A protein has these predicted regions:
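Short capping micro-motif at the N-terminus of alpha-helices
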Residues: 77-78, 256
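Conserved catalytic or metal-liganding residues and their short signature motifs at active sites
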Residues: 3, 24-37, 85-124
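Structural motif marking the loop-to-transmembrane transition
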Residues: 9, 13, 17, 21, ...
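N-terminal type II signal-anchor transmembrane helix
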Residues: 1-67, 106
Length: 312
C-alpha cells in the first residue's frame, strides 16, 4: 500500500470513530429517555389507590371503651389496641428529643424523605454498624395508613411510602407528625403509643418519665421483642444506653445527665394491663354481664375501638 492509500485509510478511520462514539452515546441517551418514560408510567401505576393521608383519625386508630363505676373509677376497658392518645405537650421532652435523636436526627431539616440520611445509613452499615434510613414520617406512614403493606419488601411499597411521607409533610407541621408518630408506634407488651407504654412499663404518664425511663421506651419500637426489658434486660439496657449516647451526640442532654442516666439500673413498675384486649380491675362478673349486653347491640370492633366511657 502506497503512502497516499495509507493516508486515505487513516482518514477514513478517523472519520468513522466519532460516528461510532456518537451513535453509542445517542443510543444510550435514547435508552435512558425510554427507561425514564417507562419508569414514570410504572411509578404512576404504583401510586394509584393510595389511602387518604389527610384524615388524622387514620393515624390514631383505636382507643379503648372504658367502664366506670358511679364514683368515676375505671373498672374495666375493652380494646383492640391498648392506646391512649395525648397531646405533644403531655409527653416528656426526653421522649421527644430521644425519638428524634435515635430515629431521625435530621427530622427538622428534611421534607419527609432524607437522601442524606440514606447515604449516612449506608456508610454506617458498610463500616460494620447499624442504622436505619427511614424518616419518622416514613415510619408513621408504614405503621398506619400503609400497615397492610408494611411487610411487603418491594420497590413499589417503598415508592408509595416515600410519596405519602412527602405529601404528609406538605400539610402537617413537624410537631403534628411527631405527635401522631408518638401516639401510633408500637412499644411492645400490647402498648401502642407512648402514653400506653409509659403506663404499661412504669405505671405513670408519659409526661412524668425520667430521662432513663424515656430512653428505655424510645429504644423499644426498633425491635420490641428483642429489647423487651422483662425478657431481655441486658439487651434493653444496651439499647437504652445507645439512645442516651445519641441524645448526647445531638446536644439534647449534657454529659452529666448522660452519665447519671446510664448509671441507673432498669427499674420497671409494670401495670395491671393485660394486653389481651380486656382489662378488668374490679367486679369481673358484672363486667362480663355489661360486655354481653353491649355485644347484643354492637359488634366486637365497635365496642373495642369506639373510645367510649360507660358510667354504671
Amino acid at each position: 500500500m502506497g503512502p497516499r492509500q495509507r493516508n486515505r485509510h487513516l482518514r477514513a478511520k478517523t472519520h468513522i470513530a466519532p460516528i461510532i462514539i456518537g451513535s453509542f452515546f445517542g443510543f444510550m441517551l435514547l435508552a435512558s429517555v425510554a427507561f425514564g418514560v417507562g419508569m414514570i408510567g410504572v411509578v404512576d401505576t404504583w401510586l394509584q389507590d393510595l389511602p387518604d393521608y389527610t384524615d388524622t383519625d387514620l393515624y390514631l386508630s383505636s382507643e379503648p371503651t372504658t367502664i366506670l363505676d358511679a364514683e368515676g373509677n375505671e373498672i374495666a376497658s375493652f380494646y383492640t389496641q391498648n392506646r391512649t392518645t395525648v397531646a405533644l405537650d403531655q409527653i416528656s421532652d426526653y421522649v421527644i428529643d430521644g425519638t428524634v435523636a435515635t430515629e431521625d436526627e435530621r427530622f427538622y431539616e428534611h421534607g419527609g424523605f432524607d437522601l442524606v440520611g440514606i447515604m449516612r445509613a449506608a456508610w454506617v452499615q458498610l463500616t460494620g454498624g447499624s442504622e436505619g434510613a427511614s424518616t419518622i414520617t416514613q415510619q408513621l406512614v408504614r405503621n398506619t395508613i400503609l400497615s397492610d403493606e408494611q411487610f411487603d419488601v418491594t420497590l413499589q411499597r417503598k415508592v408509595r411510602e416515600i410519596y405519602l411521607a412527602v405529601k404528609m409533610e406538605e400539610i402537617y407541621s413537624k410537631e403534628e407528625i411527631l405527635n401522631m408518630y408518638l401516639n401510633a408506634i408500637y412499644y411492645g407488651h400490647g402498648a401502642y403509643g407512648i402514653e400506653a407504654a409509659s403506663n404499661v412499663y412504669f405505671s405513670k404518664s408519659a409526661s412524668d418519665l425520667t430521662l432513663a425511663e424515656a430512653a428505655l421506651l424510645v429504644g423499644l419500637p426498633n425491635a420490641p421483642s428483642q429489647y423487651d426489658p422483662t425478657i431481655n434486660p441486658d439487651y434493653a439496657l444496651q439499647r437504652r444506653n445507645t439512645v442516651l449516647d445519641r441524645m448526647l451526640r445531638n446536644g439534647y442532654i449534657s454529659q452529666e445527665e448522660h452519665d447519671a442516666a446510664q448509671a441507673e439500673p432498669i427499674q420497671l413498675n409494670l401495670s395491671e394491663t393485660s394486653g389481651t384486649g380486656v382489662d378488668v380491675y374490679a367486679y369481673p362478673y358484672f363486667v362480663d354481664y355489661v360486655r354481653d349486653l353491649l355485644s347484643n347491640e354492637f359488634d366486637y370492633n365497635q365496642i373495642s375501638v369506639s373510645y367510649t366511657h360507660l358510667t354504671l
